[in-house]
Amino acid sequence: MNEDNHESSSSGCDNQIEFLVSEAEQRRRRVNHLDTEVHGLGYDPFSYCGRRVHVLLLTKLISVLTIPFYVAIIIFISFFGNATSVMFSVIILGSVLISTCYGAFRGAKMCLIPFVIIQLVFLIYDLILITILLLAVVFPKMFLSALLRLPLEDIPFGTDQVLLGCSLLLALLLAPLVWTTHVVYIDFLFISQVDETLHMLKEANQKVSQDDVSPNRMMF
């Protein structure tokens, strides 16, 4: 009787092992098939420059290159703002910079969110400034236009040329703002996908471990 139970439990264990192996093989074939299709199409949503540069590397470069950009903003505010605005800019930009560098180099996706938010704020602020400068050029008799032209009266250049030049410089910042925000957001999606995959693998390993333990209990 015990031998029959031992044989039945052994056969059940063998069947479970064969089922797990066959299921893993089918998953491996599906992954290989999808990977072959992706390589055949030459498309990778997490790579740039012909799949030569990964989004992780780009995010690290962006986190480092934003340091002089944020420093320039703080210096600009120190010339035209008061001590309170400088203090708040140092606190906000410094915390965002530290969070972005940590998230880029440590793979912490939640630390990348402040960078995306402040980039969107910069983008909206840039668009508003461009609109104001263009309105000041198109409608020179507006009260806002008079306020903008008053500090420019002593400049040897024409006020319209100065306003158009400033709007052009602000327009040139739109592309870097949009691109860096896009790259960091894609990195956020990549880290989320990696975390989800690792969580699924952990659950699969726990399930396999439970399936391996249960036949041993039956045999005992």
From Swiss-Prot:
Highest taxon above the source species: Eukaryota
GO CC list = membrane
Protein name from the UniProt record:
Uncharacterized protein B0416.3
Q: Which residues form a coiled coil?
A: none
Q: Where in the cell is it found?
A: Membrane
- The principal localisation class reads membrane
Q: Membrane-spanning regions, if any?
A: 61-81, 85-105, 115-135, 150-170
User: Which keywords does this Swiss-Prot/TrEMBL entry list?
Assistant: Membrane, Transmembrane, Transmembrane helix
Q: Which membrane topology describes this protein?
A: Multi-pass membrane protein
Supply the source organism for this entry: Caenorhabditis elegans
